[in-house]
């Protein structure tokens, strides 16, 4: 059963957990332009500027057994890594080739000397990796629906429904399951849906309020219906635009963390 987000929020003091567990932190929860949006005076953007609120572009850091896995490298990556105390990154997964999900990889230039392992579907790596020849990295193709071990966790990619090849993922460790799928419509294939069920934590695309429909994303009503169908124990929206009010009950917040 879905629960209001406010009832599930964890205080920072509750997040000191065994390193063998997954610590999942959303480094950003915004869409391609972030919130507040440049040159916008809507209520949400005004409130953001008045109260110092932000939604940086969506990416996720997972810490597990001393290793750090980054999902997507946004244009806000430098700020996001500083906010999270800039841990050493052992692996990166690119979900797809839209600029707000991978162009921040350039921020690793002269920051991390070791070769960075970058995972993703073959077509995603071909496109994104070709732009960053100046950064030492190793590209490791991952086929959808085939589990692989990344940073000591079992990761399985599955396709979403977007205007470019895009992949969500199921990540398992120590008997817990995290499912992440952004930049997709709700009409996901049955094969993908089968991997998304019964997650301990589910993060979904929720870019617009109910009644606003576009061809390549879910609105929040779509996301809520899907989360209920998938029987998620805990559910939040990410990749939100400036049209989503700050008090929306399933809105994740930048730098919010969970321990699984």
What are these model-derived regions, one by one?
Residues 8, 19-83, 166-182, 201:
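Conserved beta-strand hairpin/beta-sheet module of binuclear metal-dependent hydrolase folds
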Residues 74-77, 99, 123, 160-165, ...:
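Short beta->alpha connector loops
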Residues 62, 146-151, 257-260:
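Short acidic-hydrophobic surface loop/beta-edge motif
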Residues 188-201, 206-260:
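Binuclear metal-ion centers of metallo-dependent hydrolases, dominated by the metallo-beta-lactamase
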Residues 18, 115, 119-167, 173-174:
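Metallo-beta-lactamase
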Residues 70-74, 90-98, 120-121, 179-184, ...:
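Active-site neighborhood of phospho(di)ester-bond hydrolases with catalytic His/Asp-centered motifs
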Residues 65-120, 198-201:
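Active-site metal-binding motif and surrounding structural segment of the metallo-beta-lactamase
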Residues 4-7, 15:
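Cationic, low-complexity basic patches in intrinsically disordered or flexible, solvent-exposed regions
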């Amino acid at each position: 059963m879905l629960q209001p987000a406010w009832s599930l929020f964890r205080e920072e003091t509750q997040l000191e957990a065994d390193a063998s567990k997954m610590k999942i932190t959303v480094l950003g929860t915004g869409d391609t332009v972030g919130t507040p949006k440049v040159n916008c005076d809507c209520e949400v953007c005004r409130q953001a500027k008045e109260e110092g609120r932000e939604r940086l572009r969506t990416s996720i850091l997972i810490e597990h057994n001393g290793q750090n896995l980054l999902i997507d490298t946004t244009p806000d990556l430098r700020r996001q890594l500083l906010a999270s105390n800039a841990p050493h990154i052992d692996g990166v997964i690119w979900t797809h080739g839209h600029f707000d999900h991978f162009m921040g990889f350039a921020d690793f230039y002269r920051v991390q000397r070791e070769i960075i392992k970058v995972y993703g579907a073959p077509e995603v790596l071909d496109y994104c990796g070709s732009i960053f020849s100046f950064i030492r990295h190793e590209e490791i193709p991952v086929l959808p629906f085939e589990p692989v071990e990344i940073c000591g966790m079992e990761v399985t990619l599955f396709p979403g429904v977007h205007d470019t090849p895009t992949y969500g993922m199921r990540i398992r460790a120590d008997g817990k399951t995290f499912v992440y799928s952004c930049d997709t419509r709700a009409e996901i294939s049955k094969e993908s849906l089968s991997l998304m069920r019964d997650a301990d934590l589910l993060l979904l695309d929720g870019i617009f309020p109910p009644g606003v429909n576009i061809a390549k994303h879910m609105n929040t009503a779509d996301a809520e219906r899907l989360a209920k169908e998938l029987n998620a124990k805990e559910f939040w929206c990410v990749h939100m635009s400036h049209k989503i009010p700050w008090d929306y009950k399933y809105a994740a917040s930048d730098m919010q963390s969970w321990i699984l």
